[in-house]
Amino acid sequence: MWGLTVLLLPVVSFALYPEEILDTQWELWKKTYRKQYNSKGDEISRRLIWEKNLKHISIHNLEASLGVHTYELAMNHLGDMTSEEVVQKMTGLKVPASRSRSNDTLYIPDWEGRAPDSVDYRKKGYVTPVKNQGQCGSCWAFSSVGALEGQLKKKTGKLLNLSPQNLVDCVSENDGCGGGYMTNAFQYVQKNRGIDSEDAYPYVGQDENCMYNPTGKAAKCRGYREIPEGNEKALKRAVARVGPISVAIDASLTSFQFYRKGVYYDENCNSDNLNHAVLAVGYGIQKGNKHWIIKNSWGENWGNKGYILMARNKNNACGIANLASFPKM
């Protein structure tokens, strides 16, 4: 019976959306997200992608209602994009080919005492509102800024929006909207003796000339530390003891693109294919499923108001503990 039910899911899903309902939903979706297309042909091709994504979402959620998945999906502003396009235009992690970890930057966890069962830095006032990087490969800048903001709050008691555009334009070791790496950003802030606030250096979502101005400086750092590679226990300790941590993940799957709620775990997520930088702002457990609380930079229309709960202690799912780091202040 179970096998028959699963086989019937695509048929049931397709039957849920006759053509006239699809037409209505398409028009509503375009209006909701203010979508306009250059030509009729462009709109037709985008609608086909949207319909394919809608079908994927419907089938997944039917399976979730049967207990197959621990999370649900929903249509969002990325509905007319393929997962390949999302990775190309809206991620941006670029790991240096010559990257090497040294004892000078390695974070050695303090294992004394027990780490809290759950931590949420949003409730402690360490986390600024969710941002939207747009179609610029600047995830690394938003991840870095988020970690810096958390440490600034911890050290000074003040929560300020720092400038990802400052990093996009000025970190010469990275490639701006073409991609970058978080520790390069921390090194820049250290050598530059500061990073501007968002108010002083607003985000524009494209590469510009470096316009850093010391009068707008809002934070600085003394270097960075890296979590032992692939060690989720060390990452948990770092989150609990340090604050929000910059992490890298595989965000290439359609399931990630349309995540809505629940604890995200997709066995197809590749821990060796790290393409997106995000911010770990806590951890916990939901309905028996351990998770990380992750802040993304795709706006509040994505996920659960811009956040996703990602599986914790499930063989380093999506590679979340492979390239974790934080700044020292």
From Swiss-Prot:
Q: Which SMART domains does this chain map to?
A: Inhibitor_I29 (SM00848), Pept_C1 (SM00645)
**Signal peptide position in this chain?**
1-15
Return the broad EC class. hydrolase
Question: Which residues does the annotation flag as glycosylated?
Answer: 103
UniProt keyword Magnesium present: no
**How is it placed in the membrane, per its record?**
Peripheral membrane protein
What is this enzyme's EC?
3.4.22.38
Biological role: Thiol protease involved in osteoclastic bone resorption and may participate partially in the disorder of bone remodeling. Displays potent endoprotease activity against fibrinogen at acid pH. May play an important role in extracellular matrix degradation. Involved in the release of thyroid hormone thyroxine (T4) by limited proteolysis of TG/thyroglobulin in the thyroid follicle lumen.
Q: Report the protein name in the record.
A: Cathepsin K
Protein species of origin: Bos taurus (Bovine)
